[in-house]
């Protein structure tokens, strides 16, 4: 190996070693810690909705421009729009309740970005799925939800009949 290659390799190794020199400075540096923190953020977010804590619920969003996509094709909201739409729900004892199915949330991280999919149970909507993207907020030293999509989990065996119901609904409008 020539001197130039050795210097380049040494520089790369040093960069990697110092990039995440302290987990305390940046918890996103520890993969295991990051995954655990994402789980905690998501659990707290779902819990906040179930007790109608709008401050905690919307405080978990990365910004007023973060996106929430609901189950209806018209439901694509920024955080600001979603706050306005859901205000009446957060005035109740519980806005809505989605309970993550144990062992059915899968989280991946890469640097300051995390993505997940999860299965959720709900009394009013049955089994659902959620997918999300979180970003690490260095100022808040925590993960924040940048994008979340909620969808019904429709068994393939009943998909044709569900599609027929949707077609009839669309035709009636």
Model-derived regions: residue spans:
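Bacterial N-terminal signal peptides that target proteins for export
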Residues: 1-8
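Bacterial N-terminal signal peptides
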Residues: 9-17
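Hydrophobic pocket/interface hotspot
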Residues: 45, 57-58, 65-66, 82, ...
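Short, low-complexity N-terminal intrinsically disordered segments enriched in polar/charged residues
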Residues: 20-60, 112, 162-173
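Short beta-strand edge/turn micro-motifs at domain boundaries
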Residues: 127-162
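A mature extracytoplasmic/lumenal domain signature
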Residues: 61-62, 72-73, 118-122, 132, ...
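A short gly/proline-enriched turn/hairpin at secondary-structure junctions
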Residues: 66-77, 90-95
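Surface-exposed, charged secondary-structure patches
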Residues: 81-127
């Amino acid at each position: 190996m020539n001197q130039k290659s050795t210097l380049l390799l040494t520089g790369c190794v040093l960069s990697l070693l110092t990039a995440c020199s302290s987990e305390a400075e940046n918890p996103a540096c520890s993969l295991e810690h990051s995954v655990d923190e994402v789980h905690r953020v998501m659990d707290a977010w779902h819990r906040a909705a179930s007790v109608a804590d709008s401050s905690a619920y919307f405080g978990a969003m990365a910004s007023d421009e973060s996106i929430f996509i609901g189950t209806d094709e018209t439901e694509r909201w920024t955080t600001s729009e979603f706050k306005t739409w859901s205000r009446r729900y957060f005035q109740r004892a519980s806005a809505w309740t989605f309970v993550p199915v144990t062992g059915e949330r899968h989280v991946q991280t890469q640097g300051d970005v995390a993505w997940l999919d999860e299965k959720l149970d709900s009394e009013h909507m049955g089994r659902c799925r959620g997918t999300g993207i979180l970003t690490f907020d260095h100022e808040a030293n925590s993960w924040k939800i940048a994008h979340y999509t909620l969808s019904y989990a429709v068994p393939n065996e009943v998909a044709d009949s569900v599609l027929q119901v949707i077609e009839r609904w669309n035709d009636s409008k």
